[in-house]
């Protein structure tokens, strides 16, 4: 196993670590859980609320494009920016910054549909967040301390990539860290990814934050180049619509002052300084997509 699972073994030994991890494998069935109970809950839901039929945003593609002209299978670029959030929201609590770290994000919001989501993790434990985003399942219902990719995604299961493959999509994942970390190399195929591009496959990328991370972390800008490169490769090799999932690393914990030069720091923490490049990288991904003849969802 890779990731934080090795910490238990390192501190307490192989046997204790192994036995501890065994307790995370079994998911207990909730009391009174049955297909009949689920059907009964659905019967209490208004029929109009079961399936959304109206656009969520008045300016969205589905709202402004006639239904008979809409592309049914858009390109989907699913980007998870490590630990990214709008820190400018802290200003309502009296916290100020030396620079506008959310300027690019706010510019993106002017031309995009957007909303809010709550993450099950912060600064790390990325496989928990990925698992929720790709499957719709909550890690809250897994045994405490378990990591889904290592202990529960051990065979093909319902997930967005598998579902989209049934709809004719080609699928790929891009992550700028080692393939075996969190057992992504084993979990991704079970989720439905045809290809997985990891750090081992990336050459000539720019890295930062070498004070804490010995070999550094790939920048969001370089990661954007990798995403574009993979998109172009998929586009040229097949006529199938594209689903591309990508996970960045630049703003991963640990957040200490030695990770950033003086001109990139702000008053409160070094974490906000790492947030600045992320929206620009998103712009970079959207620029080539804007020339396509079909809509592109870059989340």
Residue ranges and their predicted role:
Residues 11-71:
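Helix-hairpin-helix/helix-loop-helix acidic hairpins
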């Amino acid at each position: 196993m890779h990731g934080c699972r090795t910490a238990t073994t390192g501190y307490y030994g192989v046997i204790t670590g192994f036995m501890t991890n065994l307790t995370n494998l079994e998911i207990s069935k909730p009391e009174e859980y049955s297909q009949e109970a689920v059907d009964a809950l659905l019967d209490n839901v208004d029929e109009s609320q079961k399936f959304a039929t109206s656009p969520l945003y008045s300016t969205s593609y589905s709202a402004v494009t006639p239904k008979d002209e809409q592309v049914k299978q858009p390109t989907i670029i699913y980007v998870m920016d490590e630990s990214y959030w709008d820190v400018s929201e802290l200003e309502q609590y009296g916290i100020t910054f030396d620079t506008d770290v959310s300027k690019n994000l706010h510019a993106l919001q002017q031309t995009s549909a957007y909303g809010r989501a709550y993450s099950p993790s912060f600064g790390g434990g990325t496989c928990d967040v990925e698992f929720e985003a790709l499957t719709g399942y909550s890690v809250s219902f897994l045994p405490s301390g378990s990591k889904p990719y290592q202990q529960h995604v051990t065979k093909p299961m319902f997930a967005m990539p598998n579902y989209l493959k049934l709809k004719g999509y080609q699928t790929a994942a891009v992550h700028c860290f080692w393939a075996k970390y969190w057992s992504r190399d084993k979990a991704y195929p079970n989720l439905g990814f045809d290809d997985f591009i990891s750090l081992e496959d990336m050459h000539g990328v720019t890295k930062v934050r070498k004070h804490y991370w010995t070999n550094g972390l790939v920048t969001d800008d370089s990661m954007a180049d990798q995403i574009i490169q993979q998109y172009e490769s998929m586009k040229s090799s097949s006529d199938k619509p594209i689903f591309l999932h990508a996970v960045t690393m630049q703003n991963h914990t640990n957040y200490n002052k030695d990770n950033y030069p003086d001109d990139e720091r702000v008053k409160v923490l070094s974490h906000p300084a790492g947030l600045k490049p992320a929206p620009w990288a998103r712009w970079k991904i959207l620029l080539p997509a804007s020339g396509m003849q079909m809509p592109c969802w870059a989340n």
